[in-house]
């Protein structure tokens, strides 16, 4: 039986943890890296490293096409996205699966339905579960957000809507 090959589509500590676990499972590990991470520890600990190019995350770790190409060119059997970057990107998961490579993570449909926090709250409510108190529609004005926060109780997590062209997501904890 040939050893399975896992491409880790992430960097740093996240990649190191995945590499350690993968080696415990006797998987051949493939790290990816950008210009900024050429000498990073995860590239040294992996069995193989694949150069993505670019120095910015948008040019490397957030570049779906480059990561799919890396998985193909390295003959990866599995792709682990880690977290952040493209881990919550349904299109990335779908592209990996379309190439016949196993995606380690939620199904693309699940990522899509859970990626929109308001839609995921509605879905959870629809199946009879009680979501954590929160909004069912986004606040357009600060006064709406303050009113809602006061009704839920502090602290609250204030989450910005993703900016579609960058896939950036951010949140802030508000204590009052």
List PLM regions with ranges.
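ATP-binding N-terminal substructure of ATP-dependent carboxylate-amine bond-forming enzymes
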Residues: 1-126, 139-147
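Acidic active-site catalytic centers that drive phospho-/nucleotidyl reactions
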Residues: 80, 84, 159, 172
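ATP-grasp fold ATP-binding core
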Residues: 124, 148-168
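Single conserved hydrophobic/aromatic residue that forms the stacking wall/gate
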Residues: 167-176
């Amino acid at each position: 039986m040939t050893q399975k090959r896992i491409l880790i589509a992430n960097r740093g500590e996240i990649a190191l943890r995945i590499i350690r676990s993968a080696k415990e499972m006797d998987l051949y590990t493939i790290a990816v890296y950008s210009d900024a991470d050429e000498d990073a520890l995860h590239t040294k600990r992996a069995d193989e490293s694949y150069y993505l190019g670019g120095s910015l995350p948008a040019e490397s770790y957030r570049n779906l096409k480059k990561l799919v190409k890396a998985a193909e060119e390295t003959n990866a059997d599995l792709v682990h996205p880690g977290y952040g970057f493209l881990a919550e990107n349904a299109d990335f998961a779908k592209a990996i699966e379309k190439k016949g490579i196993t995606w380690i993570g939620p199904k693309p449909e699940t990522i899509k339905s859970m990626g929109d926090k308001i839609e995921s709250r509605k879905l959870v409510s629809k199946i009879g579960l009680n979501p954590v108190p929160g909004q069912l529609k986004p606040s357009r004005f600060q006064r709406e957000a303050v009113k809602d926060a006061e009704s839920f109780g502090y602290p609250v997590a204030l989450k910005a809507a993703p900016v579609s062209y960058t896939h950036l997501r951010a949140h802030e904890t508000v204590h009052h």
